[in-house]
UniProtKB/Swiss-Prot annotation:
Gene3D superfamilies cross-referenced by the UniProt entry: 2.40.50.100, 2.40.50.150, 3.90.1100.10, DNA-directed RNA polymerase, beta subunit, external 1 domain (2.30.150.10), DNA-directed RNA polymerase, subunit 2, domain 6 (2.40.270.10), RNA polymerase alpha subunit dimerisation domain (3.90.1800.10), RNA polymerase Rpb2, domain 2 (3.90.1110.10)
Organism of this sequence: Emiliania huxleyi (Coccolithophore)
Protein name: DNA-directed RNA polymerase subunit beta
GO CC, one annotated term: DNA-directed RNA polymerase complex
GO BP annotation list: DNA-templated transcription
Gene that produces this protein: rpoB
Amino acid sequence: MLDRNKNIYKYLLPNLLDVQRASYCWFLEKGFVQELRTFSVIRDYLGDLELNFATKFYTINPPRYTLEEAKRKDATYSVRIFIRAQLNYLEGADPQEKQVFLGDIPLMTDSGTFLVNGIERIIINQIVRSPGIYYKSEADKQGVRIYTASLISNRGTWVKFEIDKDDLVYIKIDKAKKFSIFVFLKALGLDNQEIFNSIENINYFRKTSNTDEQLTTEQCLLEVHSHLKPEEPATAKGCQKLLYAKFFDSKKYDLGYVGRHKLNQALMLDIDSDVRILTSLDLIGIINQLIRFRFMPIVSDDIDHLGNRRIRSVGELMANQIRIGLNRLERVVRERMAICEHSYLRVNTLVNPKPLAASIREFFGSNPLSQFMDQTNPLAELTHKRRISVLGPGGIARDRAGFVVRDIHPSQYGRICPVETPEGPNAGLIGSLSTYGKINAYGFIETPFYKVKQGKVLKDLPPIYLDAIAEEQYKLAAGDVATDEHGVLKQPDVPVRYQQNIVTVSKNEVDYIAVSPIQVVSLATSLIPFLEHDDANRALMGSNMQRQSVPLLYADAPLVGTGLESQTARDSGMAILSSNCGKVVTLSDEQIVVQDKNGNQLIYNLTKYKRSNQDTCINQKPCVSLYEKVRVGQLLADGTSTETGELAVGQNILIAYMPWEGYNYEDAFVVNERLLYDDLHTSIHIEKFEIESRQTKLGAEEITRDLPNVNEKSLSKLDENGIIHIGSWVEPGDILVGKLTPKGESDYLPEGKLLRAIFGEKSRDVRNTSLKLHHGVNGRVLDVKIFSRANQDDLSPGTNEVIKVYIAQIRKIQIGDKVAGRHGNKGIISKILPRQDMPYLPDGTPVDILLNPLGVPSRMNVGQIFECLLGLAAEHLNARFKVIPFDEMNGVEASRGFVNNTLMEAAEKQPWVFSTQHPGKMMLTDGQTGEMFDNPITVGRAYVLKLVHLVDDKIHARSTGPYSLVTQQPLGGRAQQGGQRLGEMEVWALEAFGAAYTLQELLTIKSDDMQGRNETLNAIVKGYPIPRPGTPESFKVLLRELQALCLDIAAYKIEDTTLLTEDKEINLMSELNSSRDDQSVANNYLLTRGTTP
């Protein structure tokens, strides 16, 4: 726990964005060059031409637009790659050399994002099985143990080695049948003596080699070929080529530098890291280790251990995509070399940048690891950049992931957060990097520890980072073990982690200690105070809901925090910090200029009322005054959801745990109207509306104010060009941009064509296709952006003009909005009470929110009680508290003692704050009756968030609206202004009650009986009785489907002409069946009954 005087944890967190930035820097410096080297020479099929890329001489040109310009123009923020290429004619002609354009590569911004077509995107980290060798022992159906070793490569063939029940060693390559390892080694060129000299347990291996010792290398090659390609005729030369392609061609087989590192580590080899193909030493080492594994009690490798799983970050993912693009480029170059006459070939015509550009575009546009960035608030941004997923190409499919993959593994301690993960189908598949976690050069997650020597923690030395494999050989104490002021462990016996178990050892045996108690959890979870008093399920909800909190009009930093709020705000990039010492010489709401002692000026531009990806408002405001002296790292401006450089996603609200006339039943909240009138939970939301003016076959569409058949009142808010004025207040149905589209003859109704033919009427051949504000939105026009070809803007082919209108809405809190605390205590607002009706404190202050006390015991999130009571004390002491979770090192029930002591301190100023008879509770007065409640009530200041699930975005009603063309039934969903579906279960319910007429009405005239619903509307308008329903359109669709399957089926009704005469059958779909031949119709009519006697 941190008190107000000293900070126990001196060690700062790493920069929270390093996971993204370091990986992309590696890609630009090394990864891109490595991929280029693989394709540095491209030869044609005949070997006459050769194209060389000089990988040392590639240049990166600066972006065409600045970041702000790219955002404004909806462009991609990217760099242009040029490389020197040389075309060599092997028959003797002079080589050509030229600098060629290879393609555009999106450039990462300072905040770790990519701007693609004006939209901020993020590449999330993928966790995959690491290349290397994995040993496994399992019993077959007969209970006999089979020993296997799987060699996983980074790219190319997977190989499996196996010892079967007869103690024979086999090899299995991809999906081919297994065959003797001895035959395979001989096929690679090793002779019997070389093999026997290399194998450690030669007597055991003799069983495998006995039958094949007499075979020649050529015979072995033929046998290998027959196993790998049984459908092809076996030849020794063909097998050599096949083995080369599978194991020794670096383009097709690659262990990767990680695979080589793991292989060297597992087999105790010293092969150079640049050798990424298989060697005979690898194969012999694997066989020796497998035989050792057969006899010695070695534990099978755990694939879910983080030592066997690695992170593929943005740099590696992009390098893989560059390889795909260069592969396509190589194919294109070879085809052009083969088709074109050599004398006409030029370097710049050979190298086409399109394959690489298409590959990059494909990656950013459709890869599941490239995601639309969550910009709801700064914490959501940071967490999204630190996300780790097992899904995506090369990962695990969601529907095939079992419980073992999703479960928490002991090796995740301090690396992947055990709390923060989504609820639902992705639970356990998507995680978050822990606060102190760092990804090393090989992609393994490391976490820091302090060295412990003779029971003393050496905090003066820098911490040591250990990966999951390295830490298993040490005894590691948790970060919440108590130490004295000299860093000596207080307890003689300490619980430690050792080889995935918890054991108790003496303090002198401890090797390392974690640097912080919050080392185990992620950033969002570490922002929950008193986390250790919450059930893990509720902590998970609290972590996820902090990311869904809407930025409020007035940011308010929490009274009770954990100490990480300032770093979160700083690393998110929302808070602007000074990068030089000096004096503020210019200050406005859009710009701060700081001048240093040498007269150099540094300009800091502020973002003003910009729309985020989630339609929330991004805004920054200065925190310094004119001519103020500033230091390096000092806060210059606060951003969205930050206050004085601290994360502020909610409001400190006075709450009471008490029922109120049933209105807070089942997690509902009763709130004070003060939240509404004082704008405590008011937020700004900005929506974008876009319209294009295109070039059609009948002419260009026109943006204009001159709209036919539109009254002047509807045009009053438009300027002379037909575009809405900035600052106008708009309601649903208002015209934002006037547009006319030319229409052809086919667009007219039949009666319109007739009128034109008779009278020769020359009406305007245009259709009104103006952009109107859709249902459920109103607000003020914040900005209008116009892009046109006349202004040299990049527009898609066929588009003449694009107009974007931004509308700002101020949303106050209302009934139906979702609010939550930081401990998973969420609820919907059920009633807004006048402040005079709310219960009030002894000093007359009315409570702001009433929560149901029954929501605490069963949920076991008691942290909220500690938080609200400490918040109450903080308010009266005019202080803020930073409470690090896991505080038992300070004594038993340390949280309870600390909160009680703080309340007693506050009671010196306000005696009613703390009562010895019922600590943490006080007597409240009912605002409606003026009488005191019978029992004392828990009251405090809690941090309450307004979540992005706003009722304005959810509530929906439909009277009339669009229908589906085929079924003629209303569309579904709010976006389509749809209706509610009466599904099969609802039909069953009405059938069960025997409500036949209600059901018939719902399935016909209220749904898809086209004629019936028009007649019903007419009857309602004129006051006539409701007519009888007809045939639903969906039934006709069903008949058409069956007729498409060549089933002659139709619907009939029997019409009685008289009671005693012959009945006739009338075809209900006769108007639809007019095209069918008369004989078929006659056959259908033979189903008549005889007369009644």
